[in-house]
């Protein structure tokens, strides 16, 4: 179509007609016509689009569908395209747009079109408020205020709709604005004559409160609107409108404190609606959601209303009984996903969350009797619901259920024999969930009865759905079951699994049924993964059948089976090891290559993809360097998957509603009626592909070198891929391994790659919002420094890093202060304390990563980094103050330990900061703190120089006192104690003039060997070798009396795997043993005091050293 004339001039009649025809073509049923119209529309200049669309919206003769399309396009233009279009309109056109829009809203008679015009009005208003909150459309605001003061109900509706769409329209709200807003909402929410007005005002009030979620004072001011909102919730539900109820759920989730003054009323209303079977399932679920959400977001408040929770429990359980008599369930060959819209699934989830939110002390007494009654019911639906309720409350009621776990488990096991298959399946699900919730004590206590019962259920060929549930439960049980316990049942388990595999393979060939077989191969993989080399005797009976499944599963509907079986084969191969697997390796690799070739020509969401990716990684681990020949075939699709960009969109709420049924999209509400959407399908595959690339770089090194540059260019930008945490984790984890690969090509190539990585990695430490991801990024940075070595950071990098670490430490202290404030609040209780402790653990974990980064800097830069470090010194000193929590003191001491170890003798300049904390913390109640202090005292002796002599002298009595403490060797204390023993050894070795060596040595020898701390153990053995090789009389003892003790120390060192083949100390110790063997009498005296295991350990030591 022709472009319109000059700015501000009206378009010609023919141009208008062309544009109207274009709008009609945009809604034409023909795809080709629509596509052509879209291309024409995209090429129309913004000025012309704006004027044409506004004219079409106002033209009542254009037809409703055309006007509707024009309204949608204009809203989109002023929303997502505002910055490109509106500022470039001439001032007079901007003025005309605003005037015309007010007139259009004011004069529109069609209710639906008026709402669309209000949406456009709100979008424009939102974009005409700047960052400071100034409204640049005062005429629009005046129109709204005039509408509020008018007696025209239609204009009230206009004002409410705009305000609901954009609650920030008043900009910087002063007292006068708040009074206007409250008057508008109050007068409309009380309107008994117009239900639509009352509903809309309640939604607008909720949206306004949500938009001001941090303004606690406003909550009090607007609290008297709550009765009207609750009344509107009730009334609208019975008019088949759940929009206000949805708003109430949002308030419960985001601003629960607003509900405080009327919490009882809110809960009573929710309880009433939840229990009313006349309402739709969705409405009842939403009403329940209000209660459940408050249990999570306002736990202390809700615990004051347990009477209402107790009344809600029967409603929840009744909803869980709402199941269909589905004859197809028994014969289904697909494991359908849970229907989250069903009452049963929604209620089960609600009970789970309620238990976790309020805890077992509250929930278990309310549910136990109801559940027991349901389990005794003749109705299979009640028995099913009772079992699923037990499954749901386990996590939240963990502590309270443990004492009754025996009777609970025995009760559940009985239902594996229930006449109804769905009850048997529910019993399997419940056992699986308990195995998760109560692990590992559940496995240790019930291994015999649970494994036996699940195997028996799997062997029952009556129903493959039940078999599949039993096999799934067994997988979950195995995950946390000690290997030593699984071995007890291995023979029976393998026999059972193999016989079922043979039957299911025949069923696949004969009938094409696959459901139980899909789960069975996963169970076999789980068993092999758990028992590792113990699977070798059974390898030959499973592998032929597994390969046969892969060969058979070629049809489209068998792709998932094929993928899971490939995964199983790779798990089995990894379990039995390269030597055993090599007989099938070539054949298996050909099967994988065939599948890989097929995948390259298949859809992105093919279910085999994720299984293939992880299977290749396991094959790499099995084959080692032999895998390099296959890497070119694997790497291309892997990089393609890892590089895939997700579809994203910024949409108005109305557009989201139109897309809500679209597969694979998830939306986050950004407020102001805007949502950010991302198509999630493919994100998991992308994360898995990234993790596999990390794995290949780590395992193959030289074999991965040629892909290093391509992968690093892809991975570095993914440090900012905020759509999926595991993608960022993989990107961070990859960096040190990619640097190791780059090093193979020489220092210049390595330096160039580090320049590309370093800056984004540092920035990611400063900007990453997720604690778990942040810890991985910090860990990666620390490892990268160690790879690159001294001088790898320039002044700009060090300055930025210093600022970031300083901010992390300051944030750490600030968060601790805030937690102390919360402990003084009225609502503080055990549940709040648990939440605060979780927060504290996250903060401490980041503190450990700060320590890791500083460790890397100290170990690579040595004393040259100390001038930079001094900006952090006051914060580190603050960590070791006696008033700080013990983890702070532990990690503060660890940082000073690193300074002493790597920056001495210069470290002595800081001695007054850490001298007394180091000595005093030797008496701390927490072994972690004692360990850090003891290690520091040891490295003072080893690396500190003469300046530390007096401090080492002071340390010895404190170290001895810890070692001699009655409970020093308990599991909790042993690591700290062994660090004390090692520290004394270091003082004896490196600062002998600080102590009476001959007096202390006999005690030190009596404390050996060290069992738990392998690093310190090998240091003590090296010192022992020094003493023996120098024939130190105190160590050798009169008439060689100490040699039996020394021989036992050496034997224990081998048994504890302290002594390894590679360690030079092994040869020294072996020579000591051989020297003693030269005297037959002495040797017999030494070995007579050893048990068989110790003698075997000595024999093994002599054979390799």
Curated annotation (Swiss-Prot):
InterPro entries: ARM-like, ARM-type_fold, HEAT, Importin_beta, Importin_rep_4, Importin_rep_6
Chief location category: cytoplasm
Gene Ontology CC entries for this record: cytoplasm; nucleus; synapse
Localisation: Cytoplasm; Nucleus
First and last residues of every HEAT repeat: 219-257, 361-399, 402-440, 444-483, 866-905, 908-946, 949-987
Pfam families (alphabetical): HEAT, HEAT_EZ, Importin_rep_4, Importin_rep_6
Domain of life: Eukaryota
Gene3D superfamilies the record matches: Leucine-rich Repeat Variant
Keywords for the protein's UniProt record, in alphabetical order: Acetylation, Cytoplasm, Nucleus, Protein transport, Repeat, Transport
PTM annotation (N-acetylalanine): residues: 2
Gene Ontology biological-process annotations: protein import into nucleus
Function (record text): May function in nuclear protein import as nuclear transport receptor.
Record-stated family: Belongs to the importin beta family.
Identification of the protein by name: Ran-binding protein 6
Organism annotation: Mus musculus (Mouse)
Gene name of the record: Ranbp6
């Amino acid at each position: 179509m022709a472009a319109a004339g000059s700015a501000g001039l009206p378009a010609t009649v023919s141009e208008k007609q062309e544009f109207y025809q274009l709008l009609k073509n945009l809604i034409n049923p023909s795809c080709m016509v629509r596509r052509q119209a879209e291309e024409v529309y995209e090429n129309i200049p913004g000025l012309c689009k704006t004027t044409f669309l506004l004219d079409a919206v106002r033209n009542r003769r254009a037809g409703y569908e055309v006007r509707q399309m024009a309204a949608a396009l204009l809203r989109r233009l002023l929303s997502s395209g505002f910055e490109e279009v509106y500022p470039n309109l001439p001032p007079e056109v901007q003025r005309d747009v605003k005037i015309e829009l007010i007139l259009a809203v004011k004069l529109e008679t069609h209710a639906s079109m008026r709402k669309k015009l209000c949406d456009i009005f709100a979008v424009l208003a939102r974009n005409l408020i700047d960052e400071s909150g100034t409204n640049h459309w005062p005429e629009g605001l005046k129109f709204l205020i005039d509408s509020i003061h008018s007696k025209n109900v239609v204009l009230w509706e206009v004002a409410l709709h705009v305000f609901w769409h954009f609650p920030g329209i008043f900009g910087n709200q002063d007292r006068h604005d708040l009074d206007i807003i409250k008057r508008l909402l109050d007068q409309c929410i009380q309107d008994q004559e117009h239900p639509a007005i009352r509903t809309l005002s309640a939604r607008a009030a909720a949206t306004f409160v949500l938009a001001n979620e941090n303004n606690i004072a406003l909550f009090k001011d607007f609290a008297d609107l709550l009765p009207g909102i609750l009344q509107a919730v009730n009334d609208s539900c019975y008019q088949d409108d759940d929009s206000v109820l949805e708003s109430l759920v949002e308030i419960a989730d985001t601003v629960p404190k607003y509900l405080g003054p009327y919490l009882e009323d809110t809960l009573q209303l929710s309880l009433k609606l939840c229990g009313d079977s006349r309402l739709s399932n969705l409405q009842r679920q939403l009403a329940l959601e209000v209660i459940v959400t408050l249990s999570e977001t306002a736990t202390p408040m809700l615990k004051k209303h347990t009477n209402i929770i107790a009344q809600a429990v029967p409603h929840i359980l009744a909803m869980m009984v709402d199941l269909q008599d589905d004859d197809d369930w028994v014969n289904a060959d697909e494991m359908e996903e849970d229907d989250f819209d069903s009452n049963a699934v929604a209620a089960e989830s609600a009970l789970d969350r309620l238990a976790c939110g309020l805890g077992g002390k509250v929930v278990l007494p309310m549910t136990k009797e109801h559940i027991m009654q349901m389990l005794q019911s003749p109705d299979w639906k009640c028995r099913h619901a009772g079992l699923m309720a037990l499954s749901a409350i386990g996590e939240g009621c963990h502590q309270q259920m443990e004492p009754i776990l025996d009777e609970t488990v025995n009760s559940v096991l009985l239902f594996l024999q229930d006449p109804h298959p769905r009850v048997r399946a529910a019993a399997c699900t419940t056992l699986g969930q308990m195995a998760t919730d109560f692990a590992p004590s559940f496995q240790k206590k019930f291994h015999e009865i649970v494994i036996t019962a699940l195997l028996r259920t799997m062997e029952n060929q009556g129903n493959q759905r039940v078999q599949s549930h039993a096999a799934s439960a067994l997988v979950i049980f195995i995950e946390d079951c000690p290997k030593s316990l699984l071995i007890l049942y291995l023979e029976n388990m393998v026999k059972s699994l193999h016989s079922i595999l043979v039957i299911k393979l025949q069923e696949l060939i004969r009938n094409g049924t696959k459901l139980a077989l899909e789960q069975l191969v996963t169970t076999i993989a789980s068993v092999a993964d758990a028992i590792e080399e113990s699977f070798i005797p059974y390898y030959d009976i499973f592998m032929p059948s597994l390969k046969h499944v892969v060969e058979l599963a070629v049809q489209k509907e068998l792709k998932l089976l094929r993928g899971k079986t490939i995964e199983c084969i790779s798990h089995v191969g990894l379990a039995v090891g390269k030597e055993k697997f090599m007989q099938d390796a070539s054949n298996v690799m050909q099967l994988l290559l065939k599948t890989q070739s097929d995948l390259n020509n298949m859809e992105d969401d093919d279910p085999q993809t994720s299984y293939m990716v992880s299977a290749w990684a396991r094959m790499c681990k099995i084959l080692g360097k032999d895998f390099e020949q296959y890497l070119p075939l694997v790497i291309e699709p892997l990089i393609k998957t890892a590089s895939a960009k997700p579809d994203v969109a910024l949409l108005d709420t109305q557009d989201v509603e139109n897309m809500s049924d679209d597969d694979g999209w998830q939306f986050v509400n950004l407020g102001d009626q805007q949502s950010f959407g991302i198509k999630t399908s493919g994100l998991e595959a992308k994360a898995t592909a990234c993790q596999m690339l990390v794995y290949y770089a780590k395992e193959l090194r030289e074999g991965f070198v040629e892909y290093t540059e391509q992968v690093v260019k892809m991975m570095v930008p993914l440090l900012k891929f905020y759509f999926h945490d595991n993608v960022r984790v993989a990107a961070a984890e990859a960096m040190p391994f990619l640097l190791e690969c780059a090093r193979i090509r020489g220092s210049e190539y390595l330096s160039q790659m580090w320049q590309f990585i370093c800056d984004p990695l540092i920035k990611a430490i400063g900007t990453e919002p997720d604690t778990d991801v942040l810890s991985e990024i910090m860990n990666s940075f620390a490892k990268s420094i160690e790879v690159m070595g001294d001088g790898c950071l320039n002044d700009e990098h060090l300055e930025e890093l210093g600022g970031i670490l300083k901010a992390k430490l300051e944030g750490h202290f600030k968060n601790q202060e805030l937690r102390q404030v919360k402990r003084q609040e009225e609502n503080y209780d055990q549940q709040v304390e648990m939440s605060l402790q979780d927060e504290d653990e996250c903060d401490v974990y980041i503190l450990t990563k700060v320590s890791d980064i500083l460790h890397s800097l100290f170990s690579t830069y040595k004393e040259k980094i100390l001038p930079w470090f001094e900006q952090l010194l006051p914060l580190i000193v603050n960590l070791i103050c006696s008033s700080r929590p013990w983890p702070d003191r532990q990690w503060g001491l660890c940082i000073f330990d690193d300074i002493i170890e790597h920056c001495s003798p210069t470290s002595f300049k800081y001695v007054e900061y850490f001298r007394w904390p180091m000595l005093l913390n030797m008496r701390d109640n927490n072994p972690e703190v004692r360990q850090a202090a003891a290690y520091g005292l040891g490295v003072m002796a080893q690396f500190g120089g003469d300046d530390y002599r007096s401090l080492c002298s002071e340390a010895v009595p404190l170290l001895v006192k810890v070692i001699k403490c009655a409970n020093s060797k308990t599991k909790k204390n042993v690591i700290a104690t062994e660090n004390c023993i090692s520290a004394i050894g270091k003082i004896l070795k490196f600062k002998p003039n600080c102590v009476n060596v001959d007096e202390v040595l006999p005690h030190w020898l009596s404390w050996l060997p060290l069992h738990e701390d392998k690093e310190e153990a090998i240091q003590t053995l090296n010192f022992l070798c020094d003493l023996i090789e120098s024939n130190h009389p105190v160590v050798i003892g009169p008439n060689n009396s100490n040699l039996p003790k020394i021989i036992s120390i050496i034997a224990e060192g081998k048994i504890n795997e302290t002594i390894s083949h590679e360690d030079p100390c092994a040869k020294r110790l072996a020579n000591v043993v051989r020297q003693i063997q030269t005297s037959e009498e002495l040797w017999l005296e030494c070995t007579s005091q050893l048990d068989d295991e110790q003698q075997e350990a000595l024999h093994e030591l002599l054979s390799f050293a």
